[in-house]
Swiss-Prot record:
Protein name per UniProt: Ice-binding protein
Site (Ice-binding): T251
Subunit structure as annotated in this protein's UniProt entry: Monomer.
Domain of life assignment: Bacteria
Cellular compartment(s): Secreted
Secretion signal, residue range per the UniProt entry: 1-24
Mutagenesis or variant effect for T266Y: Has 33% thermal hysteresis (TH) activity of that of the wild-type
Keywords annotated in UniProt: Antifreeze protein, Disulfide bond, Secreted, Signal, Stress response
Length: 276
């Protein structure tokens, strides 16, 4: 009888031990789950400035910036084009609404047509104020379109200094000046699009190069800058520049792209080639 009386007591003790083990196991599992969740949450909160070399698109498909009639121009300016002879420009050149006298290029520097709004300007110029008005209007529309794109894939990449980086397709935005002190690569396919929004100036150091890789096309690259653009001596640039102010090319700098300035373009023995 004494043995039978002890059985319920042992059963209670065993059940208690099993319950404690189960609770410890559940607590351990919950702790691991919470740790995993916290790590994931922290990683998801990292800004795009944490990406050191390149990155991936957010999933949005970028449409090209429509340049309209302005697409025919290698250089288009509202207030004039100055030049230190001899530059080599492939593509049309124009200035409006400023007088043609503000186009200081010589005819043998341009493989294309020089357009002016009046009878002044280089001897080989063609006067076509209507075409220039349309082109300059399209330049403004293109600038606004590029500046108005939302939800950037990268915000303030490199804290505004992107030397040494490889830039994959997407929408990039900097809320201040952008500096390119060393070579960069733009890598993607022939149909990919890049739009770079710069709230300040864009400065490229001397002898620095932008290289295209993987089939990337200069015609699909757009640099929208609220401030001035300066390309250092002997540097090489790729893409279409849409500047709200001026574009200054230092001695022997080159660009495979277009230069569209809402003020002046300054040349010093430069090479400008409209992309195909």
């Amino acid at each position: 009888m004494k043995i039978l009386k002890r059985i319920p007591v042992l059963a209670v003790l065993l059940v208690g031990l099993m319950t404690n083990c189960s609770n410890d196991s559940d607590s351990s599992s919950l702790s691991v789950a919470n740790s995993t969740y916290e790590t994931t949450a922290l990683n998801s909160q990292k800004s795009s400035t944490d990406q050191p070399n390149s990155g991936s698109k957010s999933g949005q498909t970028l449409d090209l910036v429509n340049l309209g009639v302005a697409a025919n121009f290698a250089i288009l300016s509202k207030t004039g084009i100055t030049d230190v002879y001899k530059s080599a420009i492939t593509g049309d050149v124009g200035a409006s609404p400023i007088t043609g006298a503000a186009i200081l290029l010589k005819c043998d520097e341009v493989t294309g047509t020089i357009f002016s709004v009046d009878a002044a300007g280089p001897a080989c110029k063609i006067t076509d104020a209507s075409r220039l008005t349309t082109a300059v209007g399209d330049m403004q529309i293109a600038y606004d379109n590029a500046a108005g794109r939302l939800n950037p894939d990268f915000l303030n990449l490199g804290a505004g200094t992107i030397g040494g980086k490889t830039l994959t397709p997407g929408l990039y935005k900097w809320t201040s000046t952008l500096n390119i002190p060393t070579d960069i690569t733009i890598s993607g396919s022939s149909t990919d699009v890049w739009i770079f929004q710069v709230a300040g100036n864009l400065n490229m150091s001397s002898a620095v190069r932008i290289t295209l890789a993987g089939g990337a096309q200069a015609k699909n690259i757009f640099w929208q800058t609220a401030g001035a653009v300066t390309l250092g001596s002997t540097s090489h640039f790729e893409g279409n520049i849409l500047s709200q102010t001026g574009i200054n090319m230092k001695t022997a700098a080159s660009i495979n792209g277009r230069m569209m300035a809402q003020t002046a373009v300054t040349l010093q023995m430069n090479t400008v080639t409209i992309p195909q």
